[in-house]
């Protein structure tokens, strides 16, 4: 018997940036009754709250669920409330260097975005995302 099943969030459990539908939430709860489950995604913790946790009952079944935001560079588990067990965050200097390099590469490539939905370069603490 498997001890842990790991899923990607976007495009696997739910469409990209969308909440779990009722059927998937029910199936996930059933699975948590049998085995531990982890969900990983490139999104930040807030994205998991919106897409997953609002669709599940906040009860002891969540103690079998692990959440791995920002491609696994953060790790959350439930023990009556959600606790961050680790976060491999960049230092302020590392963030500045990454953002500066991204901005330089974008300018060098002559890439210009007409319209964005939020920040094009997003600081997720343990991940800098360009989208």
Label for each model-derived stretch:
Residues 126-131:
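A generic structural motif
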